[in-house]
Amino acid sequence: GLLQDEDIEVSSVKEFAGLSEQELDRIETLVQSLLKITRLDAGAIVLEKNAENVADMMRDIELHFAYRARQEKKKIILSGSDYLSLFCDRDWLSEAIDNIVKNAFDHTESGAVIGITWRALPSGIQIVVKDNGCGIHPEDIHHIFKRFYRSRFSKDTQGIGLGLPLAKAVIEAHGGAIEVDSELGRGTSFTINFLIPTKL
């Protein structure tokens, strides 16, 4: 009767409110990302660089995704020296790598492993984010850093196509470079190189 109808209405309203909140969060993320990219483009951001411990930064990123990893039954594996320092703006660079790790979560199934490794090279420092997910379609590989690019092959319907372009902009603002390597059905690897970290 009436009470049942009311229950249905209440749950519908709650569901709608939940969806609206999700949508608002999505729009807020979009606006924030757009503002950040625009400011980076305009050179309006002054990076506050300090010698940062890379292992500490990566552990913070792992912690940021710990809840999601548990929920989705995925694993983050960290590997690298505890004593490596990178001259960078910790907040900005953490956000860039965060976006790459989020991308790995968005494109992997339950049980996936996401590896974050870092090492010193003769010319600088390298950070790699690698997953064993669905991989990137060959048609998409050259477009993934384009703003608002949405793959027609992707199952991710919530993405806004700004996470990776923002990551690239931040890495390049640090004098770094990012490359992607992917095999369909096998996974994706993002390699970030920073030249001579003491002089970035």
Q: Model segments located where?
A:
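Conserved catalytic submotifs in the C-terminal HATPase_c
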Residues: E48-A51, R70, K75-L84
